[in-house]
Amino acid sequence: MTSPKLDRRQMLKLEAAAIAAAAAGLPVPALAANLATEREVSELKWDKAACRFCGTGCSVMVATKENRVVATHGDIKAEVNRGLNCVKGYFLSKIMYGHDRLTQPMLRKANGKYDKNGDFTPVSWTEAFDIMEVKWKEAMKKRGPNGVAMFGSGQWTIWEGYAASKLFKAGFRTNNIDPNARHCMASAVAGMMRTFGIDEPPGCYDDIEATDAFVLWGSNMAEMHPILWTRLTDRRLSAPHVRVAVLSTFEHRSFDLADIGMVFKPQTDLYLLNAIANHIIKTGRVNKDFVAAHTVFRRGQTDIGYGLRPEHPLQKKATGAAKANDSTDMSYDEYVKFVSEYTLEKAAEMSGVPLNRLEALAELYADPKTKVVSFWTMGFNQHTRGVWCNNLVYNIHLLTGKISSPGNSPFSLTGQPSACGTAREVGTFSHRLPADMVVTNKEHRTKAEHIWQLPEGTIPDKPGAHAVLQSRMLKDGLINAYWVQVNNNLQAGPNANEETYPGFRNPDNFIVVSDAYPSVTALAADLILPTAMWVEKEGAYGNAERRTQFWHQLVPAPGESKSDLWQLMEFSKRFKIEEVWPEELIAKKPEVRGKTLFDVLYKNGQVDKFPVSDIEQGYLNDESKAFGFYVHKGLFEEYASFGRGHGHDLAPFDAYHKERGLRWPVVNGQETRWRFREGSDPYVKQGTDVQFYGYPDGKARIFALPYEPAAESPDGEYPFWLSTGRVLEHWHSGTMTRRVPELYKAFPEAVCFMHPDDAQEAKIRRGDEVKVVSRRGFIRVRVETRGRDRPPRGLVFVPWFDESKLINKVTLDATDPISLQTDFKKCAVRIERVNVS
């Protein structure tokens, strides 16, 4: 693997990197130092960029020399990270320079022509688009618009996601486009929409320094959001009264700081949340004035199923599956009666958490003098009742009035750098449009069609195929042309053997993967398109606290690599309107006849109205040079017009290149820290104090939702729970981080974390190879009985970053029926020792 070309004189060891690396058990040789301070190096060109990894939204300073990134360090001007980076962030300068970086389009060929069983062969971009054009048109002729689909990403830049959504929803006229944020943030979206009628957190990171208590629900912030964890740790250690509660199905590094650590049985978080609400009511700590003025009560639909195939027995039994998102009015008294059965005593019995710890947790929320921030990530969201979990934690904050004020915040932390900015805000989900609009709402479609200058009826009125459904439809031959960008869904998607891989190799299907490296998904495709990464293109991300951040293109992409944005827009030139729109639609706007999708979607007088001369002097911009106008500015300003004036306001384009990000809504140049709060949020009417303006009545919803069991639980044949997740050193499927030598060496392969007593009982020793077996498949992996992750008896944890140990061959493709997000935290497995002969 290659590393940045800096000689010894050009590199000094970075103390902060050494500290962070030591915490992760990392060696930090001289070559790994990532902050240059000698005069020669400090004269390099430095510029800001958002970090390429998680949704925290750290800002970094990037040094370039001779068209190459040679160093990075934390941006001391950034409010989010204040000059710090986690260990992944310290090695950002190496993610683009793996030895197997893709630089040419590659098509499967045999005897000089495309063959699904052929070998990957370098081809030109023209030939790549030629075969794509043929396959797209064949699929649409055979099955109509829904014969094609796209799987995108929370790692798309804002304009990449926006351009992709336009191409599919307006151009090809299919809503079969979904981001991999379906696997990480869909439950958070649905939870916000159900409770508040509008998406994204009411608070911000400033709450960390203002609160009295942190409660982590299914969130290992110490490893998954380490920069926020440093801020949380600083608050805890500098203010003796502050308390930290951590809830998880197994112990992890965040427990090291916990004052109240709680390991609960999988799925019983539903019970715990209701029990806390009941405790608040029983002890007379409901903020009655707040509840009366700002909330109404709803009874949610129950027995909603598990998002499995319709013929699955669990789906057949689910009486409420068809109306999973429905709810009905109820009174406060009826809600009180509903939660009364959820006592702390029963919760302790159900969950396995000691009663005294549950009482201490409940008191943090109930005490009116204690400000509380609730953080959660995949433990809540990757859950067959993930939306319910989100609703139930909002219930607690609403009952106590602990919301939308400094130090009081329910906060879903984001996993990807722009799952908020691109997937949620742009609306790249199969049911969404920009600014919280949805395809099922005629007024919303009409507004989108007006902004996009399209005839009425262009955008389909039914949601398209979501992530898991796309895999099923590919397998069943109902989607025949498929484009994957910026994700690795063969490694990341559930039940890979039965539901994902078969669709990729279905002979009727043509699969395109745009990637920078030969991932598992890319190697299963028919055509691989080499993609520009990170600062090889101009970009924008939106982080978890509604902060939008921009960066300039700083270096060129290698070889023939092109950005995802260029690929989308260039491919759109291959389609005349007459080839993709019905005659009756064209008749409503005859001037589009003879034009290409590129002309109608991107050269429409709005996207192309900013000249190349608007690009800040001294910066590259390959896409704008190719198309002849400032693409990013035009796309952003058109997109921003969706949200301005109704609570999603973004600042003018040029403002973001000057700032370390701004938190929307941005009105009159001022960002918003606490939404729904008078004096902070410009959309709150004077004299209301708090206004949940997502709903017309200005009130939030408190939901009555019961405990319901998991889709699959351990039994005699499969006696263990399996949970999957991430580790500090690697990000998602490891496509980038496993190509950084220092990160690879720190955690080279996935292991199966197991309780030592379970291992001893099975005559398994630490380091032994075992099979992790489910009803769907198995992997072989070595056992770890010590270290950072400490499962209770009856549960094992296997991270999913390792492509040689595809744990998602084992997982179940059950989803939350409302959000359609996958539950990667709960399925049943057995552990078999591999006998070495």
Swiss-Prot record:
GO molecular function, one term: molybdopterin cofactor binding
Entry PTM: Predicted to be exported by the Tat system. The position of the signal peptide cleavage has not been experimentally proven.
Cross-referenced InterPro entries: Asp_de-COase-like_dom_sf (IPR009010), CT_Nitrate-R-NapA-like (IPR041957), MoPterin_dinucl-bd_dom (IPR006657), Mopterin_OxRdtase (IPR006656), Mopterin_OxRdtase_4Fe-4S_dom (IPR006963), MopterinOxRdtase_cofactor_BS (IPR027467), Periplasm_NO3_reductase_lsu (IPR010051), Prok_molybdopt-oxidoreductase (IPR050123)
Reaction(s) catalysed by this chain's protein: 2 Fe(II)-[cytochrome] + nitrate + 2 H(+) = 2 Fe(III)-[cytochrome] + nitrite + H2O
Residues in the signal sequence: 1-32
CDD domains: MopB_CT_Nitrate-R-NapA-like (cd02791), MopB_Nitrate-R-NapA-like (cd02754)
Regions crossing the membrane: none
Binding site for [4Fe-4S] cluster: 51, 54, 58, 86
A GO cellular component entry from the record: membrane
Family, per entry: Belongs to the prokaryotic molybdopterin-containing oxidoreductase family. NasA/NapA/NarB subfamily.
Function statement: Catalytic subunit of the periplasmic nitrate reductase complex NapAB. Receives electrons from NapB and catalyzes the reduction of nitrate to nitrite.
HAMAP family in alphabetical order: Nitrate_reduct_NapA
Protein name: Periplasmic nitrate reductase
Annotated source species: Bradyrhizobium diazoefficiens (strain JCM 10833 / BCRC 13528 / IAM 13628 / NBRC 14792 / USDA 110)
Designated gene of the protein: napA
